[in-house]
From Swiss-Prot:
Domain of life: Bacteria
Protein's name according to its UniProt entry: Adenosylcobinamide-GDP ribazoletransferase
This protein's encoding gene: cobS
Primary role: Joins adenosylcobinamide-GDP and alpha-ribazole to generate adenosylcobalamin (Ado-cobalamin). Also synthesizes adenosylcobalamin 5'-phosphate from adenosylcobinamide-GDP and alpha-ribazole 5'-phosphate.
Protein topology in the membrane: Multi-pass membrane protein
Transmembrane portions of the chain: 40-60, 64-84, 117-137, 142-162, 188-208, 210-230
Gene Ontology cellular component terms for the protein in this record: plasma membrane
C-alpha cells in the first residue's frame, strides 16, 4: 500500500463522512465508489473527531459544567458530520421498530420523515453519549476526556467496515450496493488501524483497563448489531452502516466511563 494512495483515500473518506471541505483535485478521476475507502475510515474518523475534541477542551478550560460541555461537543460533532450517522440510526430504528416484515422495514427506512422510534433513538443516543462523556470528564483530566472523542470516532468507524463487509446489500438497487462492498483486506486494515488509533489515544491517559473495556465492548456491540441486522433485513443498507457507528460509539463511551 502506498502512503500517497492512503492519504488520498483518507481525504476522500473525510469528505464522505463529514462536511469538512477537501481539495477538489483529490476527486479527479474518482468514480465515487467506497469499497477501498473503507480502509481509511478509522483515520478519517480520528480527524473528524478532533473538531469536537478541541471544542470540549476549550469549554472545560472555561470551567463549563461537564454535562453542558459534553452536549455542546456532541452537537459540534453532529454539525461536522452533517448528522450522517444519526440519520442512519433514526431510519434504522423506525424501520426495525415499525416494520412487521423485512420488506416493510426497508420501505420505512427509505422514508425521509422521522417517526417515533427514530426520535426516541436520537434522544437516547445524545443523552447516553453526553452522560457517559460527562462521567469521563469528571474522572479524568480535560485533555484525556477530549482525546476520548477522536479515539471513539476512529473505533466506531472501524466497526462500519466489519458490518459492511460481513453483510450483503439488503437492496440490490440501493445506494449501499452501488458503492461497492469492501474486500476482506480493506476490512481487516480498518479494524487493525481502528484498534491501534484507539490504543494510542486511550492507553496513555486512561490506562490498560479502560482500553481493553472499550475495545471489547465496541467489538461485541458491532458484532451483535450485525447479527441482529442479518436476521431482520438479511443485509446492510446505508442506514444500518450509520447505526453501526452510533451504537458502537455509545457502547464504547459507556465502557470507558464505567472502567475509569
Amino acid at each position: 500500500m502506498k502512503i500517497k494512495d492512503y492519504a488520498v483515500d483518507t481525504a476522500r473518506a473525510v469528505a464522505f463522512l463529514s462536511r469538512l471541505p477537501m481539495p477538489p483535485a483529490l476527486f479527479n478521476g474518482y468514480d465515487g465508489r467506497l469499497n477501498r475507502l473503507v480502509r481509511a475510515f478509522p483515520f478519517a474518523g480520528l480527524l473528524i473527531g478532533f473538531v469536537p475534541a478541541v471544542t470540549l477542551l476549550l469549554l472545560l478550560s472555561l470551567r463549563t459544567d461537564p454535562l453542558v460541555a459534553a452536549l455542546v461537543a456532541l452537537s459540534v460533532q453532529a454539525l461536522v458530520t452533517g448528522a450522517l450517522h444519526e440519520d442512519g440510526l433514526a431510519d434504522t430504528a423506525d424501520g426495525i421498530g415499525g416494520g412487521s416484515s423485512r420488506e416493510q422495514s426497508l420501505i420505512i427506512m427509505k422514508d425521509s420523515r422521522i417517526g417515533t422510534y427514530g426520535a426516541i433513538a436520537l434522544i437516547l443516543s445524545f443523552a447516553i453519549r453526553a452522560a457517559a462523556l460527562a462521567a469521563i470528564i469528571r474522572h479524568s483530566s480535560p485533555l484525556a476526556a477530549a482525546l476520548a472523542i477522536p479515539a471513539v470516532a476512529a473505533l466506531s468507524r472501524g466497526a462500519i467496515a466489519w458490518h459492511w463487509q460481513r453483510l450483503p446489500p439488503a437492496k440490490p438497487d440501493g445506494v449501499a450496493a452501488s458503492n461497492g462492498q469492501p474486500n476482506e483486506a480493506a476490512m481487516h486494515f480498518a479494524l487493525v488501524s481502528a484498534g491501534l488509533l484507539a490504543a494510542l489515544l486511550i492507553w496513555p491517559p486512561f490506562g490498560l483497563r479502560p482500553l481493553v473495556a472499550g475495545l471489547l465492548v465496541a467489538g461485541v456491540a458491532g458484532f451483535a448489531f450485525t447479527v441482529f441486522i442479518r436476521r431482520k433485513l438479511a443485509g446492510h443498507t446505508g442506514d444500518t452502516l450509520g447505526a453501526t457507528q452510533q451504537i458502537c460509539e455509545i457502547a464504547t463511551l459507556c465502557a470507558l466511563a464505567t472502567a475509569l
